[in-house]
């Protein structure tokens, strides 16, 4: 087992700062805009059905470009793609702030999403490659902080901006941050090597994935808006995606250089870790809609106060992230992820028993514990997935993991939104605060069920890691050489 106290090159931490800055800007923007829909509806004099496309258009552009990041990084170099993504996101933010109509705002949000979709996966790729296997866990875990904190801090920051200034500031705030990130990236990020023989773009795979994934995203988003599955806006895109995505899988498995190399899932550690991340994405990003709505609708809290009340969960996650990287090499990613999911489940029960007058102090404590569990579960699984692969496979792995987490989040959000709406309807025509609180409790029980689904993949991940260690010992014994540390252990 490697020495976890081995000093990491300060240059690696400088690269991490650049990556975290870009990632935080991208993740925060999504949740900041979410709280501004009502304001945009009033100021732009457009129906909410049109304003909703400010979010939907952004999500669709994200879903379209994420699968492209692996090929683009190989073809042009990860540093260039990261810089392009920062420029597009910053430019899109400035144009959004200048928009004079809803249609202009939607178009500029799509441009912003093209950049935002590449920032996180390419940043993770750069950081994993720069850190190397021995420091990967400790360094890559840092990139998980903005992903975890974004949904918590976004509503608070958005509420503060909207209460003190123009809605345009929620977009302008990205411009100086983006400019700083671009300058730091130019100065600090390492030059990326190009593939000796850059692969040709898989146009057929791109056509299938660039239509199937956005259609799936759109259909799932419409479930949350319409409150059911019977609408044509839900059924048509979901049915189309049910044809296009399997067609992409069939195509990718039969092609030598597909847009996304799905053969990575033949590796047990990577496949099991990916499943853990899928269910965690569904549980985390799905449940994140419930407590803010509870605080505002049942407890009558403002947007700013709601963000502060959600803070303990973000604090718990942030405190755990730096430490789990040092722990995985001792116990493996699977056991840590299992413990994290178990803690999340235990902390979820008091939330599911929530009432109209439950102590805010108690809710804060429970959220803090839940945040610790999420921090324990999320990053060990992510590091285990990356560390199980060869260096040349990382450009394929990072976008795939991001796609899985986003699709999981979309599914979780859609399911919990439907459960919540039907539970509120079941409470009667004019339900009391206690009745509405009970409806949120019902949805939170469903969230617990989604989290519990991650336990099986955690066990599989544990067994896969043990199998990989055993195989390496046998190979080392057969070769008569020293034992090489397992990749997941060496990663930390």
Residues of each region from the PLM?
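Helix-loop-helix hairpins in multi-pass membrane proteins, especially solute transporters
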Residues: 59, 66-205, 357, 391, ...
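Intrinsic disorder in cytosolic terminal tails and internal cytosolic loops
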Residues: 1-11, 195, 461-492
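Short, hydrophobic transmembrane alpha-helix segments
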Residues: 222-228
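Membrane-interfacial helix termini and adjacent extracytoplasmic/periplasmic loops
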Residues: 37-38, 104
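Flexible cytoplasmic inter-helical loops of multi-pass small-molecule transporters
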Residues: 190-207, 255-259, 467-479
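12-transmembrane solute porter fold
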Residues: 13-37, 44-63, 68-70, 79-82, ...
């Amino acid at each position: 087992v490697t020495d976890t106290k081995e000093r990491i090159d300060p240059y690696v931490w400088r690269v991490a700062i650049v990556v975290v800055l870009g990632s935080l800007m991208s993740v925060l923007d999504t949740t900041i805009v979410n709280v501004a829909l009502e304001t945009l509806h009033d100021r732009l004099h457009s129906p909410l059905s049109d304003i909703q496309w400010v979010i939907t258009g952004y999500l669709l552009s994200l879903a379209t470009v994420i699968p492209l990041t692996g090929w683009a990084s190989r073809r042009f170099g990860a540093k260039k793609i990261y810089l392009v993504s920062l420029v597009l996101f910053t430019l899109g933010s400035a144009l959004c702030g200048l928009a004079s109509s809803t249609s202009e705002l939607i178009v500029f949000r799509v441009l912003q999403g093209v950049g935002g979709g590449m920032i996180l996966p390419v940043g993770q790729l750069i950081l994993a490659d720069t850190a190397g296997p021995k420091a990967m866990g400790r360094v890559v875990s840092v990139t998980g902080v903005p992903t975890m904190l974004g949904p918590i801090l976004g509503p608070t920051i958005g509420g503060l901006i909207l209460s003190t200034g123009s809605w345009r500031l929620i977009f302008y705030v990205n411009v100086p941050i983006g400019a700083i990130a671009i300058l730091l990236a130019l100065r600090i990020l390492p030059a990326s090597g190009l593939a000796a023989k850059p692969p040709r773009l898989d146009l057929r795979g791109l056509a299938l994935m660039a239509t199937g994934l956005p259609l799936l995203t759109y259909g799932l988003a419409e479930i949350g808006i319409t409150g059911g599955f019977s609408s044509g806006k839900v059924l048509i895109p979901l049915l189309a995606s049910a044809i296009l995505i399997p067609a992409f899988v069939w195509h990718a498995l039969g092609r030598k250089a597909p847009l996304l190399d799905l053969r990575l899932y033949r590796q047990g550690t990577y496949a099991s870790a990916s499943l853990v991340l899928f269910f965690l994405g569904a549980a985390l990003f799905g449940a994140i809609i419930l407590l803010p709505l509870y605080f505002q609708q049942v407890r009558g809290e403002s947007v700013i106060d709601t963000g502060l009340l959600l803070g303990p969960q973000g604090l718990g996650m942030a405190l755990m992230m730096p430490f789990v990287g040092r722990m995985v090499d001792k116990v493996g990613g699977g056991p840590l992820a299992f413990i994290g999911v178990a803690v999340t489940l235990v902390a979820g029960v008091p939330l599911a028993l929530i009432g109209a007058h439950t102590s805010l102090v108690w809710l804060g404590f429970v959220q803090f514990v839940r945040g610790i569990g999420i921090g324990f579960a999320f990053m060990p699984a992510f590091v285990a997935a990356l560390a199980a692969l060869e260096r040349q496979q990382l450009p394929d792995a990072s976008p795939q993991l991001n796609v899985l987490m986003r699709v999981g989040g979309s599914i979780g959000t859609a399911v919990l939104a439907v459960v919540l709406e039907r539970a509120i309807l079941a409470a009667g025509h004019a339900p009391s605060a206690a009745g509405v609180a009970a409806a949120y409790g019902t949805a939170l029980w469903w969230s617990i069920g989604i989290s519990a689904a991650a336990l099986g993949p955690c066990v599989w991940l544990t067994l896969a890691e043990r199998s990989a260690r055993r195989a390496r010992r046998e190979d080392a014994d057969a070769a008569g050489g020293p034992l090489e540390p397992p990749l997941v252990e060496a990663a930390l």
